[in-house]
Curated annotation (Swiss-Prot):
Pectinolytic enzymes consist of four classes of enzymes: pectin lyase, polygalacturonase, pectin methylesterase and rhamnogalacturonase. Degrades the rhamnogalacturonan I (RG-I) backbone of pectin. InterPro entries: Gal_mutarotase_sf_dom (IPR011013). It comes from the Eukaryota. Residues 1-19 form the signal peptide. Belongs to the polysaccharide lyase 4 family. Glycans are attached at residues 27, 110, 143. This is Probable rhamnogalacturonate lyase B. It is an enzyme of class 4 (lyase). GO terms for biological process: cell wall organization; polysaccharide catabolic process. It is found in: Secreted. Keywords: Carbohydrate metabolism, Cell wall biogenesis/degradation, Glycoprotein, Lyase, Polysaccharide degradation, Secreted, Signal. It comes from Aspergillus oryzae (strain ATCC 42149 / RIB 40). SUPFAM superfamilies: Galactose mutarotase-like.
Amino acid sequence: MRLRTSLGVASACASVASAALKVTEDNSTITLANDRLTSTFAKDKGRVSELFLDGQDLLGPISGNTGVGPYLDCYCIPSGFYTAGSTDPRLEVVQGTDSTGTKYAGVILNDTYTPTGQQFQQYWFLRDGETGLHTFSRLAYYNETTPFLRNLQEFRTLFRPNTELWTHLTSSEAQTAPLPSKEAIANEVVVQDATWRFNNTPNDAYYTQFSEYFTKYTFSNCMGLFKTYWYAASANLQ
């Protein structure tokens, strides 16, 4: 009863099955699909806007910056955060056969942050017979006059579902916890930057099973592998 999604600068998650790879495109979207996984990309945003596995909606409805992904985000422009595709997203479809003889189809996002000339690329690939997307990210900056803009921080691929399907977060076989409930989040206490305390909801599953505190760094012990694993509440997703 587990769906394993691998996200990051270079990542993959796959389970081999018989499939027929298809690519469709219209004025607003590009869709990659095989017999099990369907991924739709919004051309005006440069990101995945729909993701279905065996008919199950993995993202839920779009609401702000949730219900979308995977997409590329970073803390790398002079003002701070930037989402690739926010300036001038250009999507390109690629298709071919890899060295194993397996067919693949992909979407490549190209975007340039105009004020600095920083160039962003995000790649998504779907192989015939697999149940996950392969992703790869690139950032380039060429400027001899101003060779240093700021530190490159949080260059990351984000997956932000907006559905009750997802119940747990884990970064390794040894570290797993239930997601904090909506009540716990509503009553959280800010401790410091990106760190919260759930002492107001001591009966919450996250509090009782894992920790009184939550920080965005809690599940970063596997960053060397650039992997994050999510557990799903629905059956028959494996």
